[in-house]
Amino acid sequence: MVVIRLARGGAKNRPFYNIVVTDSRNRRDGRFIERVGFYNPVANEKQERVRFTMDRLNYWVGVGAQLSDSVAKLLKEQKVVAA
């Protein structure tokens, strides 16, 4: 099954997450099909906190990819509706 989920990056105590499309059997930070955005939980007011590539996100949801709970929550917070 193809899922859209967060893959952790960054440094110790400075998390940064890529929003990736991957097979559900792959490791959290392992191989992925496509990067469709990012989430920076420690962003200050000058930095962008969340960014989605909406056309690619809608494509993957349209072909059957499932959103993880955390990605669905981020989309809801941004008041964005995935197709």
Curated annotation (Swiss-Prot):
What are the protein's GO molecular function terms? structural constituent of ribosome
Ordered alphabetically, the record's keywords are:
Ribonucleoprotein, Ribosomal protein
Which NCBIfam families does the record associate with it? S16 (TIGR00002)
The entry assigns this protein to a family as follows: Belongs to the bacterial ribosomal protein bS16 family.
Q: Which GO terms describe its biological process?
A: translation
Show the InterPro entries listed in the entry: Ribosomal_bS16, Ribosomal_bS16_CS, Ribosomal_bS16_dom_sf
In Pfam terms, one family for this protein is Ribosomal_S16
Q: Source gene?
A: rpsP
Taxon lineage = Bacteria, Pseudomonadati, Pseudomonadota, Betaproteobacteria, Neisseriales
* GO CC annotations on file: cytoplasm; small ribosomal subunit
Entry protein name: Small ribosomal subunit protein bS16
